[in-house]
Each structure stands twice: as structure tokens, then as C-alpha cells.
Amino acid sequence: MNHLLESRVVYRVAGRDYRELIFFSFMAAALFIKFYFLEYEISRFVVRFPLSVAASAAISAAAVISVSLFWRRGRLPLALLLDFLLTGLVITDLLHMRYYSDLFTFHNLGLSAQVGEVSESVFALFSPRDLLYFIDIPLLYGYYRIFRRISVHPFFRRITSRRAAWSLLLFAAAAGVVAFHIAGYSKKVPGVLRSMWDRPAVCSNVGALTYHLADSWNTLTDWICRRPLSEAEMEDIREWYEEHLSKQRRPQGIFGVAEGRNLIVLQVESLQSFVVGLKVGGREVTPNLNAFIKEASLASEAYNQTGAGNSSDAEFLANASFYPAASGVAFTRFAGNRYAALPKALLDCGYRTLAMHGDRAGFWNRGRMYPALGFERFISKKDYVNDEAIGMGLSDKSFFRQSVEMLSKEPQPFYSFMVTLTSHYPFSFPKLLAQAGFDTGEYSGTVVGSYLSAIHYFDREFGAFIKGLKKAGLYDKSVIALYGDHNAIPRWDSPTLSRLLGIDFTKDHHWRYVQRVPLVINVPGVKKLAWNQKMALGLANLPRTLALLLGVDFESGLGSDIFDAAEAPVIFRNGSYVVGKIFVEPAKKSAVHVESGEARDYAAYAEMTERVRKTLDVSDKILEYDLMPKILRK
């Protein structure tokens, strides 16, 4: 006893009470190690950047410093609670990566009701060694219980002005490291922290803790800015929607013309209309697509309607017929909504519904959004044999070959939504250029030249895909729709494209007009579908069009069908639109002919401009408040 008292006196006199410093240093190190190993797990899916480790270390230190400045009696429970919550976040991320190939996002808290449906699969991914992530919590508590008695001083000391100053200095340094890193990444990839188009990639660049801070901020601002929808507003939306549905018709000779057929929809990465029929050095860029179009029906005036979500927005338009989100990305923000999309409508009619893509399931949140749209199964990168990777994922050659094999074994009728990948910007993947075997002449080494090679490669594999469908006996049993998802060539490379096409892209109307994407539909036994080939169209028109052909009632979404003779505007996310050949831009109060550039009277489009504004407003509210179940409730 005397020895203990003596030691306590010595400890007090010497002033060497490092117990609290050791406690919080160990806690900070433990948190850093947890997130380090989380990021190591993520690095199996994406490239890891060393600076992400520094960002996680800085935030771990800042979090611990914050706790160390609290009221003395509250520090222990607060420290253990913080450690437990952050460890739970690490485990949640690990399980999400193993199951979805994606990270957890607070936006998907609305999906918590679905956890029970996949709980067995998720817990099967939990390893007993994952419990080691929690080991520091009892160690911290045990350390406190043992060492609090070795000094007459309290374990947690009062905050002196010197300690507060050092703590604030360290906190500011940590915050500065993170802020500097975020600013650099945001400048390099503008808007990525808001859109979160690839969460693992964001995490690998800025660190797991920084990713979660940005995700929390996005979710919080979305919730705070979201006001309750009044009953009057709800009734106004319902009336607008009923009026919209009342204008829809069943064109004679169209409804059910392909009843009972399979449906194959092919979304082609970066395919633009100008390559259709184009020759370079006497060779067709897309000979197989050209041949397919001769048997099918081509909408030559279809426009890209995507927003910040790029490819995912095209998928959303083509399956749900809603416009891109006003902010952020629909696929990441509204995966918890209840949709009555085309896949769901076909599923209810006895179709097998599949989505097929050679990329990770977590990219663009597809692993969560596809089931919400009504796809029974998502065949992603992990389900394919990754025998040939080009660029961002599985090559089109391997993707098409394996997909035909899978489809030949599926019960019919089925709806297969397929997304290609190889012709992705910047198109200059060495293996792709080598396999394309397309001489682009004077354009070799340019973005445009690489793009032409990439599309020629796609075209060759598309031809093999069509042959594969015929060999499997699926071609004559299937409606096949094909479209390009968005534009390919950036504006800064327009001089090269101008030289190729002989068009002056310094004039905005020419640049707008070249942003068209091909939309092709082939119905077995039907040579050409009867629609106005000169009418401007968008992907929002596709779901109802396909439903009509298959004889399925489709009452969801905001698009009409391509057989509707009424000239409807093709609406873009920024509120501009094309009607016929006139491009109307309300922000500039201008209306111009897309081919000639001739100015038109903007005032003449006032009524349609208001109609477009209302349509976007309805689309936004339906998504923000998940209104489809209420609207469709009879």
C-alpha cells in the first residue's frame, strides 16, 4: 500500500501523467487503422491513391481531438460511442463492398426496408475476423479502468489554455489537409462530390472518412431543403398527370404488334448519330449497324436528354421515362423510390426481366436502382468471366458473346436491358485501337480518330451479337431496340470534328444539332414502323413506345410514344427544348432553327415554354416525394 502511495506521489511530483494522451492517441491510431484496411478492401475494386490515407488520418485525428475537449466526465462514454459508431460504419461499408461492390450512402437509408430480403446473403459475407475491428473498444475501456488509479490526478484532465491552443492548432492543420485535398480533387473532377457517380472511386481519391463527410453533407442538405408537399400541390400534380395520360392513345395497327416477343434493349456507350452511314477513307464506320437499320426503323431526330448522370440518366429515361434529377443523380438519390417503370410493367405481364452490364454493380448505384425499376436480376461484372478487359471493364466482344449464351438459357418472354462499355471516353485504350483495325487517316491520334476506331470496334462486335442471336433462335422472336446514351466528342475537340463532317461548330445551333443519338427499333415481320421520321424525339419516348408494341399498358413516366402525331417538345434538364427543328432556350429567351440557325420569334413559344417548365417541375416532385404510388392509386 505504501509502495502504491509512493508511486502515486512520484507520478504527481514528476508531472508525467500521459494516461489521457496515450488513451486518445491509441484511439486515433485504431480508427486510422480501421479505415486504412477498409480502403485496402476497396482497392480491390478501384485504384488506390496514397493521399486518401493522409485524409483519413487527418479526420481521425480531428475527431479524437474534438472528443478530448469535451467535459471531463463525458469524455469516456463519448469516446467509446464515437469509436463504436465509426466502427459500425466501417463494417457497413465492408459488407456493402462485398455484396454490392459499392459503399454505403446515407441517401439509401430509405432502402432499409429491403435489408430483410437480402439479410442472409449479407450476413454470409460477414467474417468472424471482422470482429477484430471492435477490439480496440474493450481495450480502451480496460486501459481506463486499470490506469485511472495509478495517480492522484483524475484520468481525464481539465482543459488548460495551452492544451486548448495546441488542440485547436492540430485540428486546424488536419482540417486544412482535408480541405486542400478536397479542393484539388473537385477541381480535377468538377461536381463529383455532389453527383457521387462512383463512390469507391471517390473514396479512393479522398479517403473513406472524407467520402462519408461529403455524403452526409449531400444527404443533409437534400433533407433540409425539402419542404413538405401540400395537399393542393399533390392534387395539382395528380390532375396534371391525369391530363397527360388522357392524351395517350393506342395507335391503330401498333398496339400488340409484337405481343409475346422478347425485348432486347441495347444502350451503346457514346454512340452519336453522325457516325451512322459515315465513311472514312472509303470505309464505313458502322457497316453492321447500317445493315441493321435497313431492316429496322431509325429515328434520325432523337436527342440526348441526359444530365449530370450521363449513362445512368439515359438508363433512367429509357426505362422509367422521367427526367434527370434537378441536382445530383437520380440513380444515386432516388434508388429508394417505388417506380412503375417498364421492367416492372413487363414483369407483371409474365416477362423475365434482366439488366446486363460488364461493369461493377456499384457503379452509378445500379445494384440498387435496377431492382427498384423492376429488374429481377442484374448480371454485372462479377457474373461474367472477365476473360478480356478493355478500358473500364469487360470488352464488348466478351460481353456480347457471354450475354447471348446467357439469354439462350433464359425462359421466354424476357426483357434484357444491355449496356455496352468499350466505346467509353477517352476511347484511346491501346488494346481497343489495336483490335479495331480501322485506319482513321489524318485523324489518327486525335480524340475524334480514337472515337471512330472505338465505334468501329463496337460495330463489329454488334454484328457478331446479331449473328449470335440468330444462331440461338432469338432474333426472330425478339424486338430489338438500340440507342446511344449521350454525346461523345467534347466541345474543345470540335475543330477536328468540324473538319471531318464539314460543319462549322463555332455556331451553337450546329453543335446542338450534332448532339443527336441514333434510336433504332426492329420488330420481327415489320419492315418499317409508321412514325414521323422528321419529328424530334428523346429517350423519354422509348418506354411507352416499346410497351405499345408488346401490347402492354404503361401508365408511368412523362414521355409520350413516337407514334403520337402531336409535335411534343424534347425536354432537356436545363429547361431548354427542341420542338420540330426549333431549339428554344428560355434562359437566353431565344429560338433558332437547329439546321439553318435562323432566329424565330421567342414569344411564339411562351405557352410551350411554360408547359416544359411544368413538366420538369412535376418530374422533380414525383422523384423528390416518391409520388408514383399515390398518383397511380385508383
Pin down the residues of each PLM region.
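Generic alpha-helical structural element
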Residues: 77, 104, 123-124, 128-132, ...
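Transmembrane and membrane-interface helices of multi-pass
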Residues: 2-218
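Membrane-anchoring hydrophobic helices of lipid-metabolizing enzymes
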Residues: 217-242
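Solvent-exposed soluble domains appended to multi-pass membrane proteins
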Residues: 238-634
